[in-house]
Amino acid sequence: IESYHMYDSMVEVKRYFTKFGGHKLAAGLSMDRENLEPLRKALNEKAKLTEEDFIPKVHIDVPMPMEYANYNLAKELERLEPYGVGNPKPLFAQKDISFVEAKRIGANGNYAKFTVEMMPGGYPRKTDLMYFGDVDAFCTFLDEKYGAGSADHLFAGDKSYLLSITYQIGINSFRGRESLQYIMRNYC
């Protein structure tokens, strides 16, 4: 939770710890077991979180049509690595992209590979868009947005749907070949 400062909160209840340390986003501690419930109660009482604090926030670096994100840009972005909390991987956004087909991938079918259609220069071009999130939740969202059975139609490839997304780009290396890879992070 972005608005919750872990270390500052721990300082307020330090009497429950034998030792502790950390920063805004992470903390470590040692404590006696009998202090667990009093600690939980004290932290909950002192927390100044609102319902809005629990809503995940998405920070978009640049709204950018997918056709502008190319292999050369992905190679340039590699130079900014390593990515982490202080240096997040750039996140792009595009409104109203056409999802034309989908298939489950991965050993358990828990990921998805979508075929999306872009319109660079007014000419349609299809490309792959990977999704490593909760595919079942995506299907539920699609059915709620466009009606029951919509996800089945998309996976059958017989109906397309417009969605707005955030995405990242990277280089996929497979069998000695490199290619641009689009990865969806969020959708609405």
Q: Model-predicted segments: where are they?
A:
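Acidic, two-metal ion nucleic-acid-processing modules in DNA metabolism proteins
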Residues: 1-188
